[in-house]
């Protein structure tokens, strides 16, 4: 078995930067026992868990047109719980009936919700004051784009995966981390694979000729019985599938998801405690969380919905953080531009209105001898590490069945 990887490392949209003995998760970070596939692997490899301070915050702030408001996490958390419940309550039962199984939406649910954007649904509910700002911030953070571009159906799926509770969902999204770093999990999986690894070889073309697969890069050509294509959705369209893939699948592969936000990690000159900040769209920052403290100084993680923050401009980042934390000084920033990364072209997965109905089934359907596995079309925690493992298991099962049948 051979792994042909475009990057100079494995791990996709997750990797760890290390400095002065500290690990900084530049991409995917948080995990939870409510994400069963990744939790199983964490225990398989004996990895340990640590927590972000923001996962048990005691204070929260909301930046709105009326200025900055800081309150207890309990008070603001109650507001978020109330307004997000109203937003996701499409059946009078908090979504529990309509989306009883978050891994498998019914055709009826898709028909009634998939065409809506986050903004469409936002306009349907009475939201005012800080509840309005909280909800708009949270929705923008989740989709990492303008709420008019993000699909409402994906928010419903997250809500169901979070057990129909804002508090429960937040714990799954941003409380627990792998102490050794996500790269440690990726390396453990690679070691178990016992595969030949070719780094720095972007695949340019895949074709099927007489039942065999030909994979081409700039430097080499590989012929094999079958291939698992693990490129993310926003990159699939860059690979030339000359044969073996239907027109319908090619169309699905060319339709990108909409997550195009920014993430950075900033070490600042003071402790801000266990704190979370929210700001509604179109603020350049929609959410900032205190991850941990190093030497009495906070390490913050900030998220924005677009490219309005230059990730290489430490003073601009400082200026935006001062809107939440007056006078704060940024000492160092760690970041990666995932949207302009040629092997990612975006962050975690968020579908546009109608996209689930258009592409999900096609993306999940194998085209032997070609198989496709990426978190971007997982049924459950799509866009998360958990979804990547889910898709890997599914495609491995399909591949083994194909190889056994073709002997």
Protein language model regions, located:
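Glycine-rich FAD pyrophosphate-binding loop
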Residues: 1-19
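Dinucleotide-binding Rossmann-like beta1-alpha1 core, especially the glycine-rich loop
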Residues: 22-95
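Active-site rim elements
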Residues: 24-31, 103-111, 171-179, 250-255, ...
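Short helix-loop capping/hinge motifs at secondary-structure junctions, enriched
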Residues: 69, 271-276, 309-310
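Active-site/ligand-binding neighborhood in enzyme catalytic cores
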Residues: 99-201, 230, 240
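Central helical "cap/lid" subdomain
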Residues: 201-202, 207-208, 216-276, 323
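Conserved flavin/dinucleotide-binding core of flavoenzymes
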Residues: 212, 277-407
């Amino acid at each position: 078995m051979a792994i042909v990887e475009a990057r100079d490392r494995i791990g996709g949209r997750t990797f760890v930067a290390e400095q002065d003995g500290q690990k900084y998760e530049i991409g995917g970070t948080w995990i939870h026992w409510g994400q069963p596939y990744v939790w199983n692997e964490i225990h398989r490899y004996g990895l340990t868990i640590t927590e972000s301070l923001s996962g048990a915050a005691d204070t929260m702030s909301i930046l709105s047109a009326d200025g900055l408001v800081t309150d207890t996490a309990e008070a603001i958390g109650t507001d978020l719980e109330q307004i997000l419940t109203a937003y996701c309550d499409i059946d009078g039962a908090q979504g529990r009936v309509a989306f009883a199984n978050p891994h498998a939406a019914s055709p009826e649910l898709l028909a009634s919700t998939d065409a809506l954007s986050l903004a469409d649904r936002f306009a349907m509910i009475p939201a005012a004051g800080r509840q309005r700002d909280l909800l708009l911030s949270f929705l923008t953070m989740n989709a990492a784009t303008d709420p008019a571009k993000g699909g409402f159906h994906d928010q419903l799926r997250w809500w169901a995966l979070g057990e129909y509770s804002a508090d429960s969902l937040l714990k799954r999204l941003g409380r627990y981390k792998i102490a050794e770093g996500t790269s440690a999990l990726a390396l453990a999986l690679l070691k178990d694979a016992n595969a030949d690894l070719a780094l720095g070889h972007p695949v340019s073309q895949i074709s099927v000729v007489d039942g065999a697969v030909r994979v081409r890069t700039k430097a080499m050509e590989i012929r094999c019985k079958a291939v698992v294509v693990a490129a993310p959705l926003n990159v699939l369209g860059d690979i030339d599938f000359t044969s073996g893939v239907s027109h319908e699948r090619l169309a699905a592969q060319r339709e990108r998801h909409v997550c195009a936000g920014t993430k950075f990690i900033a070490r600042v000159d003071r402790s801000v405690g266990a704190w979370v900040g929210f700001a509604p769209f179109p603020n350049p920052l929609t959410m900032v969380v205190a991850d941990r403290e190093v030497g009495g100084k906070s390490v913050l993680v900030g998220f924005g919905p677009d490219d309005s923050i230059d990730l290489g401009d430490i003073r601009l980042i400082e200026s935006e953080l001062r809107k939440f934390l007056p006078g704060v000084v940024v000492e160092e920033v760690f970041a990666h531009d995932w949207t302009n990364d040629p092997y990612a072209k975006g962050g975690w997965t968020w579908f546009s209105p109608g996209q689930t109905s258009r592409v999900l089934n096609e993306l999940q359907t194998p085209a032997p001898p070609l198989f496709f596995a990426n978190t971007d079309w997982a049924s459950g925690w799509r866009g998360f590490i958990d979804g990547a493992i889910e898709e890997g298991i599914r495609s491995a099962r399909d591949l083994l069945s194909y190889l056994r049948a073709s002997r």
